[in-house]
Amino acid sequence: QTCASRCPRPCNAGLCCSIYGYCGSGAAYCGAGNCRCQCRG
């Protein structure tokens, strides 16, 4: 199950949910065009 299906806050604090459905940090997860939800961590 991907984090995208658990929006709006699917990830641990400080992480973002990417458009590919994984929680993580950095531009690949949090950046514009890459983030699905919880984009400020």
Swiss-Prot record:
SUPFAM superfamilies: Plant lectins/antimicrobial peptides. GO terms for biological process: defense response to fungus; killing of cells of another organism. GO terms for molecular function: chitin binding. Keywords: Antimicrobial, Chitin-binding, Disulfide bond, Fungicide, Plant defense, Pyrrolidone carboxylic acid. SMART domains: ChtBD1. Residues 4-41 form the Chitin-binding type-1 domain. CDD domains: ChtBD1 (cd00035). The keyword Disulfide bond applies. The keyword Disulfide bond applies. The modification Pyrrolidone carboxylic acid is found at residue 1. Disulfide bonds join 3-17, 7-37, 11-23, 16-30, 35-39. Transmembrane segments: none annotated. Monomer. Has antifungal activity against P.infestans, A.lycopersici, V.dahliae, G.zeae, A.nicotianae, F.moniliforme, F.oxysporum and C.gossypii. This is Antifungal peptide 2. It comes from Eucommia ulmoides (Hardy rubber tree).
